């Protein structure tokens, strides 16, 4: 039963888009089932760059069924803008299907997100200010509006009226900001709904039918494990579940149907936004990695925080999500930095002097750990590295780096990335 979940095993931005794109070539169905427009994938194909936020990466393969599931919060104008951009690049969108059960992000969600981040000042979470958290709040408060509601004017308008009245009270009385009229939201969003209507389908049936028929089904995770609302560095997290279990919950698929879970682990660590970061680097080392790795947010454009690879974090992700295979991109980036020595965190030294590989639950405990590093010599960059397609063609230094990852996590590294193009990858084990 070839059902594969691809998820980020760090703080997002690991390079999932490349590996989803690679695996999508062998998939008949690609599913995006968590998060919203706050997540971003950049895929290179044929020398052309495609930036994806809400549309599954499989859309670049004609005929591949691409599904946006229940668990996603949709930003309709952003989604339609993305669809129009892809269409202008020659991408066929006829295979896209969207769940009517997906909740909607409205302008008042975005304004509330911005207002709360501004109010917190130095204590801000570092959200993308896309309204994702407030939209999920409405979902779990059972007052949210779903795409299926927007398709029925008589169903939509009373729900929107009640929600606008509630949000206006908060915006005006708590934040001193102007609210919205029902009319300024209703008419454009009803138009968005009509544009999306041809793509709406019963995605639970579509995905489960495909699985039952033995088709290759790929679940495309958004963000990363350490941003999970339950298992991440709370409260510096997203409002959904980027772990493997979240991918199948958001699509309406049972856990027994998953055959492989691929965790994507960047060869170093990056983070956007606030929160603890035990292996964070500053100065020249961080600058070199950031520039060689083009570490600027797909969604925000913000420079990402950079640090050494943290295998305590990755081991934690492997345990929580039952990761069966690791995919490691950016081996080429480390070589290109020219840094003579690389560090890998293999444990945390606690304040009492003990060393552990357990990831702490509390922020205070995490902020007090001292990374225990293993130092390895960097490998020299050469053009041959990006043309390597066999593991033994890699420099010995890179292979030693991979072995250390496997030793600490206990999980095989099955795919390696040696460049930004989709073809620049090494398979050590077939996923599909």
Curated annotation (Swiss-Prot):
Q: For binding GTP, which residues are annotated in this chain's numbering? A: 12-18, 40-42, 304, 330-332, 417-419
Cofactor note as given? Binds 1 Mg(2+) ion per subunit.
Q: Domain of life here?
A: Bacteria
Annotated residues that bind Mg(2+) are located at 13, 40
Kindly identify the residues recorded as the active site. Answer: 13, 41
Query: What does the function comment of this entry state?
Result: Plays an important role in the de novo pathway of purine nucleotide biosynthesis. Catalyzes the first committed step in the biosynthesis of AMP from IMP.
Subunit-level organization? Homodimer.
* Name this polypeptide is given: Adenylosuccinate synthetase
Q: Which organism is it from?
A: Symbiobacterium thermophilum (strain DSM 24528 / JCM 14929 / IAM 14863 / T)
Q: Per UniProt, what is the name of the gene that codes for the protein in this document? A: purA
């Amino acid at each position: 039963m070839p059902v594969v979940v691809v998820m980020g095993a760090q703080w997002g931005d690991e390079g999932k888009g490349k590996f989803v794109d690679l695996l999508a070539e062998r998939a008949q169905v690609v599913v995006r089932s968590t998060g919203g427009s706050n997540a971003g994938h950049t895929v290179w194909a044929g020398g052309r760059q495609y930036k994806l936020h809400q549309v599954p990466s499989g859309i670049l393969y004609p005929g591949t069924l691409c599904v946006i599931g229940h668990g996603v919060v949709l930003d309709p104008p952003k989604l339609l803008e993305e669809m129009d951009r892809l269409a202008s690049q020659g991408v066929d969108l006829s295979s896209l299907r969207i769940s009517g059960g997906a909740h909607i992000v409205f302008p008042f969600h975005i304004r509330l997100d911005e207002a709360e981040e501004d109010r917190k000042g130095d204590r801000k979470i570092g959200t993308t200010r896309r309204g994702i958290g407030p939209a999920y709040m409405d979902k779990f408060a059972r007052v949210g509006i779903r795409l299926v509601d927007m398709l029925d004017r008589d169903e939509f308008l009373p729900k929107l009226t009640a929600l606008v009245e509630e949000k206006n009270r908060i915006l005006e009385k708590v934040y001193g900001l102007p609210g919205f009229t029902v009319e300024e939201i209703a008419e454009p969003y009803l138009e968005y709904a009509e544009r999306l209507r041809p793509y709406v389908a019963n995605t639970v049936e579509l995905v489960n039918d495909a699985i039952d028929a033995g088709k290759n089904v790929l679940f495309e995770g958004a963000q990363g494990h350490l941003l999970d609302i339950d298992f991440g560095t709370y409260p510096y997290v997203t409002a959904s579940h980027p772990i493997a279990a979240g991918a199948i919950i958001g699509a309406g698929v049972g856990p027994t149907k998953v055959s492989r879970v691929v965790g994507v682990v960047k060869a170093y660590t990056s983070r956007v936004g606030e929160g603890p970061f035990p292996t964070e680097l500053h100065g020249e080392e961080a600058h070199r990695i950031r520039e060689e790795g083009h570490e600027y947010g797909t969604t925000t454009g913000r420079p990402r925080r950079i640090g050494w690879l943290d295998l305590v974090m990755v081991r934690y992700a492997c345990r929580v999500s039952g990761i069966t295979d690791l995919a490691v991109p950016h081996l080429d980036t480390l070589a290109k930095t020219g840094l003579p020595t690389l560090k890998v965190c293999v444990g945390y030294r606690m304040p009492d002097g003990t060393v552990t590989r357990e990831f702490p639950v509390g922020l205070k405990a995490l902020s007090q750990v001292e990374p225990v590093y293993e130092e390895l010599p960097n490998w020299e960059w050469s053009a041959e590295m990006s043309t390597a397609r066999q593991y033994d063609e890699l420099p010995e230094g890179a292979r030693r780096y991979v072995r250390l990852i496997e030793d600490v996590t206990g999980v095989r590294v099955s795919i390696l990335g040696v460049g930004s193009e989709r073809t620049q990858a090494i398979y050590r084990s077939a996923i599909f």
